[in-house]
Structure formats: C-alpha cells, structure tokens
C-alpha cells in the first residue's frame, strides 16, 4: 500500500521562469520530488492565467508559454518518471469540482483573501470590476489541490490564505456529505522569495526586475551590472551596508565559495572594494549556475513533440487520479448512479 504523502504545486504559464522561481519554489520542489516520503503533482495552471489575461492575444500566447514552463521544469530537474506533470485545462474533473466547491463557501469568505486584491491591482482591475472568474480563482485553486487529494501545498506566506480556504472547503464537504478530502497543510521551504535586482520587492516578471533561467550570458552580466546595492555608497571607499543588500543576498544563495563571500562582505563594510568587482564575480557565478540549465532547456525546446508527449503522459495519469476522486465525490454527494453513464 502506498503510504507516500501527496504534494501539489505548479505555475501559471505566463512566461519564462526566473531566479525568483528557483529560490521560492523550484529548489524545494526538487527536494520533495527526490524524497521517498512524497508523491509530487506539478500542475501547469493555464486556466488560472485566464483570470487576469483574457484578451485574445494573451490567450493565444498561453500555448507557447506552456511549452516554456514545461521546458524550464524539465531543465532544472523536474522528472516525469518520478512526478505527475499535467495541464490543468485538460482535466475536466477540475471544472466540475470547482462548481461543486463554489456552493460550499461564501463570497465574503473568498473576498477576504488578501492576494485576490493584489492580483486585481497588479492586473490594473478596479475592485468593482472583478470578474466572476477572478473572484472564483481561490476556489478553482482548491479544486486543483483537493482533486489530487494533496496533503501538502508548498506556498509562500502571501498564499497561505488560499490553503486555509481549501481546508475550509474540505471541512465543509466532509461534514455535509462524508469524508473524502484531506485538509491540506502549508509546506514552506527555507526561502519563499528572492528580492528583485532593483531591490524593490520580490523578483517578478511584471516588475521587470528578474533574471530569467534562460537569459544569455551577456544579459545576465548587464542585469547584474545594473543591480541595486547600497544607495548611500557614493564611492568605493565609502563603507557599505551588506545586510539587505541584493548584491550580497544573491552571493549568499548562488556563490558556493563562502570564504570569498565573507571576504567581500568584510571589505565592503570597510570601503575597500568596488561594487563592480563584487558584481563581476556574482555574474560569473550566475552564468556558471545557469549554463547546464540553459543547455538542457534549449535541447527540450528543440523537441516539441517530446515535450508534448511528456505533458500528455502526465495528464493521462492525472485523469486516472481525478476519476477515482470524483467517483468518491459522486457517491458521497448523492448523485444518482443511474445517470452516471451520461457522463462517459
């Protein structure tokens, strides 16, 4: 009997992944995937993309972004032989479960989730103009989680409220109809985000402050050269602040030569080293770190049929999991068996 605990996580296909994804989620995903304790489900959440990107040209872009996200995942080590990788929109059971769950939670409860307003603000949507789909985004996310019967969900602090809503929905369903769903728990990694190269909040595509896993060596060097450091350090002889300085945050994470990093910090505090020297070494380490990832990514993108096969295989596996869950839901919910054949 399989005693492994299920974990579900994923990404919206809005473009290429960046170092913030690596620090905040991918590194943790690899540890979970390679642990004997967990079965991992990785969802490419294309339906979630539609909640804030519904224009025709944006929808058409999703297909290309699906391949990019998948190539990024595979290039960093997400393994389809160890994990289930699937496309959200190709799982019809998600739609049904989303609808059922929408009956089990109030609008006020959903609207109380802080990240919902943040999403609207980032998409330049006024609160009074929120679409039904965007309001229902957290419920759709609950359907993703509970369809897989995930017991753990790796999220940052800004998304903990989504998992708590999922727990409420699972609790409500189990109380009303009978035990089907686990109440998932938050699983946090060592780090949940990475500051952007501009020093203004976490790294993100929308903030234009990201270094992408696929950036060229020249682009990486240029982005690091422009990286925000200590604004009060006017010249190299001015003692600089290390704490909270993006330059040293990145060195701590990506430079494996810890003695060198500590030497840089000491000299920086004393005003005995130029920013450009510290930045040059960071660029070298980032280029070295990303080189094998970029090589594998290029190889995967050159074989779109192989990527398609990976996604199809994983989606078929998830369909089997989904069917088992929905059989239990139908039985507990009380749908008549005599009409079940109409669903096939």
UniProtKB/Swiss-Prot annotation:
A motif ('HIGH' region) lies at residues 13-21. ATP binds at residues 12-14, 20-21, 156-158, 194, 202-206. Keywords: Aminoacyl-tRNA synthetase, ATP-binding, Cytoplasm, Ligase, Nucleotide-binding, Protein biosynthesis. GO terms for molecular function: ATP binding; tryptophan-tRNA ligase activity. A motif ('KMSKS' region) lies at residues 202-206. It comes from the Bacteria. GO terms for biological process: tryptophanyl-tRNA aminoacylation. It catalyses: tRNA(Trp) + L-tryptophan + ATP = L-tryptophyl-tRNA(Trp) + AMP + diphosphate + H(+). It is found in: Cytoplasm. Gene3D superfamilies: HUPs (3.40.50.620), Tyrosyl-Transfer RNA Synthetase (1.10.240.10). Its EC number is 6.1.1.2. Its main location: cytoplasm. HAMAP family: Trp_tRNA_synth_B. Catalyzes the attachment of tryptophan to tRNA(Trp). This is Tryptophan--tRNA ligase. It comes from Chlamydia pneumoniae (Chlamydophila pneumoniae). The lineage of its organism: Bacteria, Pseudomonadati, Chlamydiota, Chlamydiia, Chlamydiales.
